[in-house]
Curated annotation (Swiss-Prot):
This is Bifunctional uridylyltransferase/uridylyl-removing enzyme. Its cofactor is Mg(2+). It comes from Acinetobacter baumannii (strain ACICU). Coiled coil: none annotated. The gene is glnD. Residues 457-579 form the HD domain.
Length: 887
């Protein structure tokens, strides 16, 4: 029990009303001690509310308001006796009539003393019954406040008025409709998902507000004080109540820790606090477990809890609408359409024919979703049916899964061309998908503690399936023209759907999730009618689902050998087509910021180049001489009308074969035309244009200037200052000691090519910096994003020799931060290394960049030099990461 000295004695012994401040501090310490000694969070928050009551009653009497006919009401969370350490103390002073001048003075004294105490955050309203009526009629917030107004002290005759006022000003329907619209708006503000990376545990879907919402609507109609009272009225079952109360306690407990850590009223479960709160719940990484295991398991519990709450919110409020609101509508006539012996459609929602359907016909569980998937006109599931379905889903066992009828029904759902995504989301939400595929249940709510994977694994998987389904819809053909065409000619689209369903299903188990997922998929495929050959293809897709994205991201796909090696791993067009569709859908389901026209162009180029290699024959070696001649001919055709062939060839003879192997004819013509027009002008040449293959958000910057030691470092430092993100870089040195550099950048603001003034600013900044090779612009200090400070990423540096190019390939993986590329470029410059090309990839908080370098003499580093350089680069990255974490 919580023992506190009576407030009156405490204040009397200190001879000062402000002693309430110290009293509350002492009480708060006792509450925390009680919590740490095992007292439940429910008892703690109620005790805190009661102690605040005691303080307010004391101050009420101190202001002589006990001699008035006014009433003091607790409202909001305080009205519900839900007080966390830094919760606001929301109160309402209510009067039956206009407030007298004497009482106004007393109220002023009361309010002043509240602020003088200094330990309260009061939110105060002073109203008459008439003003309550007027405000409640037009303000939903006021009406909601009145529903749970609780009389603390004062005129007991006023206790009945708050709810009476709401009954007078709002009908069941108007209040329900307004609260549901308010909830929809709140959901939209939180991305309509329970699984945000940094969820607001109070306001996001599945948060405390969803539980409050059930209470507000039920209290308005049933006139009850507690959700518990709804059990006796048949509105909620004892099981559902237990789930809600357990979830509510868990959310309160998180909020309790958030308040104490932030030392304020904080509802956002930020990265700043997730790991520490996880530890307070006992989720601590053990030896041998992944570094983020504890926090990921804690967040998994949170996401699952939020899913339970939002599902119950949906079901109970739909039940209220169907059983209370709709039947009372004027001229209401129930519309019923019989579907079959098991189901009917009632008011556009699917319902069972009788309450024993799922028990007597277990196949009806999956049949319900088959109907939903193929009837776009059905708006959802009736609440009574939903309640039966959730209970029935718990009875799905191995015998159920092994039933051929059930297996056929499941595959019919997967093959549905209409509402696959919505149907699978519903199957997951109501417990069917996780029970039918137990491995899927293991990834439900599983998050990856990073900024790259912004969805839980289960949500990502279903979004991937949604994307695949969209490839067959005409409205998305413009956005994904090539992949949509490829998808629509797949012989068996269900093969890629099953590969998608299982591609990440083994995450969180330990081991290689691709291999483990492939094993699960083979077992599933055999049971669900796929041939051995089809099962092998599904398994191959799962094992290699990252192959295409990693090749495009980390390798130079303008190199024919890279493309040939990739094509040989595929073997035929069937594997290429399936992998391409899976890869594009996967990237788009991982993080919306990850997919852009530059990345789309890389995927498209890799697909078309690999297709050409497969069609011409995998065994044929690359004929580089023919490739060079074909490229030169195509480029010359673009130039022939404007320049003499002799002038063109004069420029080209200064460039090596690699240039004509890796650059397209269009780019060669662009470069050549610019160089010829520039003539003998000693000033660096800088040109910008939209990337011809990547379109709107990717910009090509071409630089032609005398070669200099710090060319790359200077260029990326300037681009960083201009808020341009480098994605790709090629640096080619001609035999005349001139450098031809092409950078692909993403413009964060999207105005680089539409704002002439900004374009000119970028050009001038580059020309000025490159004209002063001895004046390196240096790093620009930028604000470090808050989230980055909470990720412990191991910096890695891997330096290998590319035998064919005789260049060192430097791969770095580090915590991404503003100015990283400029910092790395500066280090290369100081070490006397020339950069020939670079591939830049940012994956959430992680940067994975690749550079091809040589020494000044054009030779690669030897083993000893590699060792020394690797150590210096690693030390520099470690120093930068430490600065970020301490920022």
């Amino acid at each position: 029990m919580i023992n506190t000295s009576p407030l009156l004695n405490y204040v009397s012994s200190h001879h000062d009303i402000k002693a309430i401040n110290q009293w509350r501090t002492d009480v708060e310490k006792q509450l925390q001690d009680s919590y740490e000694n095992g007292q439940s969070i429910r008892e703690i928050i109620k005790a805190r509310s009661d102690l605040v009551d005691e303080a307010l009653v004391f101050l009420w009497k101190h202001a002589e308001l006990d001699q008035s006919k006014l009433g003091l009401f607790a409202v909001g969370g305080y009205g519900r006796r839900e007080m966390l350490p830094y919760s606001d103390v929301d109160i309402m002073i209510l009067s039956e009539d206009e407030i007298s001048e004497e009482n106004e003075k007393r109220i002023s004294t009361f309010i002043s003393s509240l602020w003088d105490v200094g330990n309260f955050k009061p939110g105060i309203s002073v109203r008459t019954i008439q003003s309550c009526v007027e405000q409640a009629a037009t303000d939903l917030t006021v009406a909601t406040t009145l529903i749970e107004a609780r009389l603390i002290t004062g005129n007991t005759q006023l206790a009945k008025w708050p709810r009476r006022i709401v009954s007078q000003t709002w009908t069941d329907k108007t209040f329900y409709d307004a609260k549901m619209a308010e909830q929809a708006k709140r959901y939209h503000q939180h991305n309509n998902t329970e699984s945000n990376l940094e969820p607001d545990i109070k306001n996001a879907p599945g948060g405390i507000r969803d539980i409050n919402q059930i209470g507000w609507i039920a209290k308005r109609h049933f006139r009850v004080n507690r959700i518990y009272d709804l059990v006796h009225l048949g509105f909620i079952s004892e099981f559902e109540l237990a789930v809600l109360e357990e979830a509510e306690s868990f959310l309160w407990e998180i909020r309790h820790h958030l308040h104490r850590l932030a030392k304020r009223d904080e509802n956002r479960l930020l990265f700043d606090h997730q790991r520490e709160i996880a530890a307070k719940f006992g989720y601590v990484r053990q030896e041998g477990q992944p570094v983020n295991y504890g926090v990921e398991q804690f967040m998994k519990r949170y996401y699952r809890t939020a899913q339970q709450v939002s599902t119950l919110n949906e079901m109970l409020l739909a039940y209220f609408s169907e059983s209370v609101i709709t039947p009372r509508l004027p001229n209401y006539e129930r519309k019923i359409e019989v579907v079959n012996d098991h189901f009917k459609i009632v008011d556009n929602k699917l319902a069972v024919q009788h309450h024993k359907i799922f028990a007597e016909h277990p196949s009806a569980i999956l049949e319900l979703f088959y109907i939903l998937a193929n009837r776009p006109d059905i708006e959802g599931i009736r609440a009574r049916t939903l309640r039966l379905l959730i209970l029935a889903a718990k009875r799905i066992n191995q015998s159920y899964r092994d039933n051929p009828e059930h297996q056929a029904l499941f595959m019919s759902i997967i093959r549905s061309p209409y509402r696959l995504y919505d149907t699978l989301v519903a199957m997951k939400r109501y417990g069917v998908l996780g029970n039918y595929i137990p491995a899927f249940a293991q990834i439900m709510g599983l998050m990856q503690y990073d900024l790259f994977h912004i969805y839980t694994v289960d949500a990502h998987t279903l979004l991937l399936l949604r994307n695949l389904n969209r490839f067959r819809e005409p409205e998305f053909a413009k956005e994904f023209p090539v992949v949509s065409s490829v998808f629509q000619r797949l012989a068996r689209q269900d093969i890629v759907f099953i590969a998608a369903l299982f591609h990440d299903i083994a995450k969180g188990r330990g081991g290689d999730h691709s291999e483990l997922g492939a094993e699960d998929a083979i077992e599933f495929g055999r049971a669900h009618g796929f041939t051995e050959r089809e099962c092998k293809l599904i398994a191959w897709l799962i094992q290699n689902h990252l192959l295409m994205s990693l090749t495009a991201q980390k390798k130079d796909i303008s190199d024919p050998d890279v493309v040939k090696d990739f094509a040989e791993k595929l073997g035929d067009m069937e594997h290429l087509d399936y992998l391409y569709t899976l890869t594009v859908a996967d990237i788009n389901a991982t993080n919306p910021k990850l997919w852009n026209t530059w990345r789309a162009s890389l995927m498209r180029q890799l697909y078309t180049h690999a297709r050409d290699v497969i069609r011409t024959g995998l065994g044929r070696p690359v004929d580089y001489q023919m490739l060079i001649e074909d490229t030169k001919f195509a480029a010359s055709e673009l130039l022939v009308n404007n320049f003499a062939l002799a002038d063109v060839e004069k420029v080209w003879q200064e460039l090596g074969d690699e240039y004509f192997i890796k650059e397209s004819a269009d780019e060669i013509a662009w470069h050549t035309q610019a160089i010829l027009k520039h003539g003998d002008n000693p000033e660096p040449l800088v040109l910008l244009r939209a990337h011809r293959k990547a379109a709107q958000d990717a910009v090509q910057i071409f630089i032609y200037t005398r070669d200099q030691p710090n060319l790359f470092a200077t260029t990326v430092a300037v681009l960083d200052r201009m808020n341009l993100d480098v994605q790709d870089a090629k640096i080619i040195t001609a035999s005349t000691a001139f450098s031809l550099d092409t950078y692909v950048v993403l413009d964060r603001f999207g105005t680089l090519l539409t704002d002439p003034e900004r374009e000119e600013t970028v050009k001038n900044a580059l020309v000025k910096a490159l004209s002063q090779p001895d004046q390196y612009p240096g790093l620009m200090q930028r604000r470090i994003p808050r989230q980055l400070r909470h990720f412990d990423i191991e910096n890695t540096v891997d330096v290998t020799l590319n035998e064919a190019l005789q260049q060192n390939m430097v791969e770095i993986s580090t915590l991404d931060h503003p100015g990283l590329l400029a910092r790395v470029g500066g280090l290369f410059m100081m070490q006397g290394l020339d950069i020939h090309s670079a591939r830049i990839a940012t994956l959430g908080e992680r940067a994975e960049d690749i550079f091809f370098v040589t020494k000044k003499d054009g030779k690669p580093l030897n083993n000893e030099e590699v060792k020394l350089f690797s150590e210096k680069l690693k030390a520099a990255l470690d120093e930068a990461s430490n600065q970020i974490c301490q920022h």
